[in-house]
Regions:
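Gly/serine-rich nucleotide phosphate-binding loop at the start of the catalytic core
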Residues: 1-76
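Well-ordered beta-strand positions in beta-sheet-rich domains
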Residues: 4-8, 150, 180
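Generic detection of short hydrophobic beta-strand segments and adjacent strand-loop junctions
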Residues: 7-9, 135-138, 199-201
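Non-catalytic, well-ordered alpha-helical scaffold segments
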Residues: 17-20, 24-27, 74-81, 252, ...
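Stable alpha-helical structural segments in soluble proteins, enriched in small hydrophobic residues
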Residues: 33, 79-90, 352-362, 366
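Long, hydrophobic, amphipathic alpha-helical segments used as structural scaffolds
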Residues: 34, 38-41, 87, 91-98, ...
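Acidic carboxylate diad motif detector
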Residues: 52-156
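Positively charged, helix-rich recognition surfaces that bind polyanionic ligands
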Residues: 142-144, 157-367
């Protein structure tokens, strides 16, 4: 299986210049090949493959722009392949048409492939060898076993540099368990399980969100492009990064616990893109990070021989009595948090009852 290990790197001034050049050249090649693809289609109504785009880069672009030859060839090829992935998504998944990349993008990255030992991690010296950069200082906080496949160098908006090493490695699956669980994704709580356990949303994030509001207010009073403007902007980026890291770490802990304790995990397949169009709920939905939680559950279930099922969005999990199956239309009102089934008299907590129904439906689908 493929697994990524992310490390912070500390490039020197010469290495930072080379990384910046690579970011710029990858962006340039991405934009040029996207424009070439569009032009050929408009003129000749002919589709252009990623191989055609790669040949165009090697034969035309590198001839006209000599400085492209100073950049790692795999990084340029992967930029073209990334453009092709975005292009294929436009046709197959009805995503938006690929956009041209801007040099002002907050997140910059490029990917290079392993060949003939050009990527190596030395845990003794705390350095990572990368094409065109040689040895880069790194914080190697955890070791790995396996064969390196690629490395992705990135720079986030706070200015920090990272490298993600993709490794082909063996993974020992978790021991089989007979316990199954249903999950009701919420806003007040991150999620509630069919066992009645509520995973709360982190309260500490509110502290950093207050800091963020204060910093954004300060930024609005700074002269644009002044030194203090950029200092405050960096503080804002660091605050965003802190919030993102706290949230992601918490989601990893929650998803690990759910996967470790259960063989079958069932949740709703929520259409988050459509839900955030409701401006009253958009921030709350983004804050609880349903997408990231379900993404983690999905890949961790595959790693560990678990079954993760998503049931239909429109399944009436909140309206059904989990004891007798009676459908109560009164529970369409979101303010109804507890109710008694008119048919069997069972008392229900709205969220726990929904989680039980979600589990029942998921198990029915795989029976």
């Amino acid at each position: 299986m493929l697994k990524a290990y992310k490390y912070r790197i500390y490039p020197n001034s010469e290495q930072r210049i080379q990384i910046a050049k690579t970011f710029g050249c990858c962006r340039f090649v991405y934009n040029q090949t996207l424009a070439y693809r569009r032009e050929i289609y408009e003129k000749e109504k002919k589709s252009v493959s990623k191989t055609d785009c790669n040949n165009y880069c090697n034969r035309e672009l590198k001839k006209d722009y000599e400085w492209l030859k100073e950049i790692d060839k795999f990084a340029l090829t992967n930029a073209i392949y990334n453009m092709d992935v975005a292009y294929q998504k436009f046709f197959k998944e009805h995503a938006g048409y690929p956009k041209f990349k801007s040099k002002h993008d907050n997140h910059k990255s490029y990917t290079t492939n392993f060949t003939n030992g050009n990527i190596a991690v030395d845990f003794e010296t705390g350095k990572i060898k990368l094409p065109k950069l040689k040895a880069v200082k790194a914080r190697l906080h955890r070791e790995y076993r396996g064969q390196i496949k690629s490395a992705t160098v990135s720079q986030v908006s706070s200015g920090k540099y990272y490298v993600s090493i993709l490794v082909e490695t063996e993974h020992k699956e978790l021991a089989h368990t007979n316990h199954n669980i249903g999950i009701d994704l919420g806003i007040k709580d991150l999620c509630i399980t069919s066992d009645g356990k509520a995973y709360e949303n982190l309260k500490i994030i509110k502290k950093y969100e207050k800091q963020l509001v204060k910093l954004q207010r300060q930024l609005s009073h700074k002269g644009k492009r002044s030194k203090n403007y950029y200092k405050t902007k960096k503080k804002i980026a660091l605050c965003h990064e802190k919030i993102r890291n706290i949230r992601k770490d918490y989601l990893h802990k929650v998803s690990h616990e759910i996967i470790s304790e259960n063989q079958v995990i069932v949740s709703e397949n929520l259409q988050i893109k459509n839900m955030v169009k409701n401006h009253h709920l958009a921030k709350a939905i983004s804050d609880v990070s349903w997408y990231e939680l379900t993404r983690q559950l999905e890949y961790k279930a595959k790693w560990n021989g678990r079954k993760y099922i998503k049931i239909d969005t429109f399944y009436a999990s909140s309206q059904l009595c989990s004891v007798c199956g009676y459908q109560n239309p009164d529970t369409k009102d979101l303010s109804v948090r507890t109710w008694i089934c008119p048919k069997c008299g069972a008392e229900h907590d709205r969220d726990i009852n929904a989680a039980k129904n979600i589990l029942t439906e998921g198990l029915r689908q795989i029976a």
